[in-house]
Amino acid sequence: MAIHLYKTSTPSTRNGAVDSQVKSNPRNHLIYGQHRCGKGRNARGIITAGHRGGGHKRLYRKIDFRRNEKNIYGRIVTIEYDPNRNAYICLIHYGDGEKKYILHPRGAIIGDTIVSGTEVPIKMGNALPLSDMPLGTAIHNIEITLGKGGQLARAAGAVAKLIAKEGKSATLKLPSGEVRLISKNCSATVGQVGNVGVNQKNLGRAGSKCWLGKRPVVRGVVMNPVDHPHGGGEGRAPIGRKKPATPWGFPALGRRSRKRKKYSDNLILRRRTK
């Protein structure tokens, strides 16, 4: 991803650094509208995910995470921006006339050909079962359940690594550092997700953040005691606790949030490191 730096003409653009413009021209049969009514609230109207609200209207792009077009070659026609994710998407024209969106693999350009199936070449953008991949292959868009479609390593710049195969399972090292077992029959896409430099972006002003549906973040220590456990005190006071807490009083910053005795515990060989 090419980073574009603005000229220092105004305060709002002085620190701005955004990616080069990638246009979006979605196909009508591959998009549909979404009714965004939650804004971070649950069914009872209580805020469960903070700092969300507003934002520009979006049309959802139908992404092909399953890659069901087996042994049919497709050609990358466009590389487009998707407002629903950090990664770019590619429009693929298959030989049988189908047109679908997939996640943009890093390094793929317009005109490249891709294919999915068994015993296909180990080439960037191709999708095939883990059993047909050599050890050390970099992959993304990984299935957890056979036939359900890719669920792991789909964010911009995400990449996992195939480190072992034994019996009916394959061992993967995920982007979070977690090492886990997955069925060798599950499929994945070769390569890394594109738009790697997305974390280098600096929007430069609060208005650009609002367009994305992200509201301001306020520290708990500057609130009143009725609003946050860290609030209150005279002047710049400490939080008054041994450990930081969430607005609802639960331990924050380091507490394990994974459900205990989950069915997949025996599949995780090493917990994530971040």
From Swiss-Prot:
Keyword Ribosomal protein: yes
Main localization (coarse): plastid
GO cellular component terms attached to this protein's record: chloroplast; mitochondrial large ribosomal subunit
Region ranges (Disordered): 1-22, 224-274
Gene Ontology molecular function: any one: RNA binding
Signal peptide: none
Subcellular location field: Plastid, Chloroplast
Gene Ontology biological process terms in this record: mitochondrial translation
Tagged with keyword Ribosomal protein: yes
Keywords for the protein's UniProt record, in alphabetical order: Chloroplast, Plastid, Ribonucleoprotein, Ribosomal protein
Record family assignment: Belongs to the universal ribosomal protein uL2 family.
Name of the protein this chain belongs to: Large ribosomal subunit protein uL2cy
Annotated organism of origin: Glycine max (Soybean)
